[in-house]
A protein has these predicted regions:
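Long, low-complexity, intrinsically disordered regions
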Residues: 1-53
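Domain-level detector of nuclease and nuclease-like folds
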Residues: 46-48, 52-186
Length: 186
């Protein structure tokens, strides 16, 4: 059984450290969770996520907004090698992707995160390879030391843009709660 802790989604303006507060909302408890590829729109050519749904992919939970953009990713991390999907990594962010963007995993492949569009967004290469990666290393080290790691990533967007403007990354390692806000550059 998957136990997921959640926190409030208040954005930290320019701060990179804060303390999340407990919230009882749990995507895993939703009665309507899409699974096994049901999160994609049928017959639209290029795969796109359905709007306003909660879905499970590789043991992690996600929520989309009214435009089919990933708004929340969450779960209890585990060390497990996932698969990379170069095709989907190049598509993440669609027409709003910037030249220096990568297709960044919200839940890294070292934690068994999906390599498909259901876990990828356009992410500035410095954010992806340095800032976000530093947080992932802390999670990886905690797991290797036998600690539990629970994460919730809330994505910010402007208007109808498919490229996130930032990531509110909230996590608990053991009993320690942390929150950072990463601007998506560009």
């Amino acid at each position: 059984m998957l136990c997921i802790n959640l926190w409030t989604s208040s954005k930290q303006s320019t701060t990179e450290t804060a303390s999340p507060t407990t919230n009882t909302t749990n995507l895993a408890d939703s009665p309507d969770i899409y699974r096994n590829g049901e999160q994609y729109k049928p017959g639209v050519g290029t795969r796109q996520l359905k709007e306003n749904i909660i879905y499970e992919s590789k043991g992690y939970y996600y929520q989309t907004d009214e435009l089919g953009r990933i708004k929340v990713a969450q779960g209890d991390l585990r060390l497990e090698t996932g698969k990379r999907n170069n095709r989907d990594q190049l598509k993440a962010g669609y027409e709003d992707r910037l030249p220096n963007d990568h297709g960044g995993h919200l839940i890294a492949k070292i934690f068994g995160g999906s390599g498909e569009l259901d876990n990828l967004v356009a992410m500035d290469k410095i954010v992806n390879t340095v800032k976000y990666r530093d947080v992932e290393r802390a999670w990886e080290n905690a797991l290797k030391n036998g600690e539990t790691v629970n994460v919730k990533i809330i994505l910010d967007y402007t208007e109808a843009n498919k490229r996130p403007t930032g990531f509110n990354v909230e996590y608990i390692i053991g009993d320690s709660k942390k929150e950072i806000y990463l601007s998506n550059g560009g």
